[in-house]
Amino acid sequence: MDRLQLRENEIFDALNRLKARRLVIIGGYAVNAYAQPRFSVDCDIVVEGQPEANAIGEVLLGSGYEKEKTPKTGFHKFERYTRSIANNFVVSFDVLIGGILDRQTDVSIKADWVFKNSEVRQLKGKTITDRLNARIVDVDALFVLKMISCRSTDIRDLFMLAPSIRDSAWIRGEVASRCDFEDRFKKVKEKITSESFRDGLQGVYGLLDLNVFEKSKKAIMALGNDTASPRNATRSRRRI
């Protein structure tokens, strides 16, 4: 088993040990529940408060993890737990307490929004055959989080998630209520229409059929053409 397999195996083992805890998986591992799996450096989870974070910390510390010092953000606190495997190859969990702070935009999203927009789904890895059921942020809410942040990694994830989104008007409304949707969409559009984007995407996700690539691209572009009212979309969306 190579180091990447060891990392995924350890993440899955730890998540199995955390099955009784009240948490929502976000980030790269959440993407794997809706799209072709990719490697992720760490596992990000959201909890509602410090008591649950403490309980999760006890499980991780008892499983060989160490708690690292983390900076205070001024909004939502987070705790990082790391474990060294295979000659200092590190596995890490980030526990976000009370919500999510996007450092790129200073947008803060509360944990209750994350929990309200989550569902129990089957989680899968990139290199292992293991499967587990876990509470994961739903695909539309994950798309919102990724679009607000809009880093290169997020844009690649957005591209892969796009064919699975359920309510584009709701997504537009949630993004627009927190930042400039048109600015975010412009950044996404510029990236996915660049000549180098497909090669970069395949470097992360593996070989993609051209038809699959074009389907995702079409889904992203359709989001920019959606003319539904963001305010009405936010009010009317069915929660899962």
Label every PLM stretch briefly:
Residues 1-240:
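Compositionally biased terminal segments of proteins
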